[in-house]
Amino acid sequence: MSVNRILVINPGSTSTKIGVFDNERPVLEETIRHDEEQIGKYKRIIDQYEFRKETILEVLHSHGINISKLNAVCGRGGLLRPIEGGTYTVNDAMLEDLKNGFSGHHASNLGGILAYEIASGLNIPAFIVDPVVVDEMEPIARISGIAGMERKSIFHALNQKAVARKVAEELNHKYEDLNLLVTHMGGGITVGAHKKGKVIDVNNGLNGEGPFSPERAGTVPVGQLVEMCFSGEYYRDEMVKKLVGQGGLVSLIGTNDAIKVEQMVEKGDPEATLIYKAMAYQVAKEIGGASAVLHGKIDAIVLTGGLAYSKILVDEIKERVDWIADVIVHPGEDELQALAEGALRVLREEEAPKEYIVREKETVARG
């Protein structure tokens, strides 16, 4: 089998994770920490790309990586327009949306730009894979009870789809042939209904929908939320933080560290026990609802993300949902590996690269 060498880039707010893979095998994985003073020199996140590019190339050189031997560069997908899942070639339309922050400004927007900047000089392809804006929801799933307020698909697409593919392989099937309920449990929690390779419904784990998590509120009583918003006690930013960042375990028990909460549970703390069980309860309830989306025809339930290392949490969830389907646990997440595998599927011609096309304010994914 021929070897494809792939450089993978995953930018964060103060660091850039890089990996070099020979097919699926990691040759190098490193987290480059950026000095906050250096980062602070740039008014816009997007202006950091040249600095980060040079830093990446220096690190690769220091490890003896000859970039002329690369076959592709793959970056973390940023805040683009809604697109279907898959591996996309970085093109001019995508670069424009990433640079202009079409759906928001975030360090992940640098992923596609850095991949393109490095790949173009080597005359090799640049890709992104399954960004958080992946949207494969069916029309019926978009409807909310208020006109003009559609439900949106924002979830852990990269890890959910990567783990779903691994589970399909373990079950000796193609991802596109299975119905799976995949739950990513980390700082946020999302439950996706995967129908034959498409995530046809999923809770918006960022903007207050679904189970509460270590630092997000999830679905809350809307009437009380409205009253709080107009009480005159809080600014808008404060309310947003209550939903994302200071919600969930942070609000209820004062920490987003699930390990600490689990230790409290093991010591018999009644409040911690109730709250931790409530989080598991809400995850199970979301899984149960998602099972109805797939008419109860579920090949497996998958639990993944950092919280899937918690035996207490996993056991609580299993007790409530294992009657629906077998529960398969894949703890943690490996974004670099997932990005490499997405690029590899295209290089091996197992799937065609998709093209990001903007037409009349719409995005069309063309495979």
From Swiss-Prot:
One of its GO terms (biological process) is acetate metabolic process. It is found in: Cytoplasm. Transmembrane segments: none annotated. GO terms for cellular component: cytoplasm. The keyword Cytoplasm applies. InterPro entries: Aliphatic_acid_kin_short-chain, Aliphatic_acid_kinase_CS, ATPase_NBD, Butyrate_kin. It comes from Bacillus anthracis. Belongs to the acetokinase family. It catalyses: butanoate + ATP = butanoyl phosphate + ADP. HAMAP family: Butyrate_kinase (MF_00542). It comes from the Bacteria. GO terms for molecular function: acetate kinase activity; ATP binding; butyrate kinase activity. The lineage of its organism: Bacteria, Bacillati, Bacillota, Bacilli, Bacillales. NCBIfam families: butyr_kinase (TIGR02707), PRK03011.1-5 (NF002834). It is an enzyme of class 2 (transferase). Gene3D superfamilies: 3.30.420.40. Its EC number is 2.7.2.7. The gene is buk. Keywords: ATP-binding, Cytoplasm, Kinase, Nucleotide-binding, Transferase. SUPFAM superfamilies: Actin-like ATPase domain (SSF53067). This is Probable butyrate kinase.
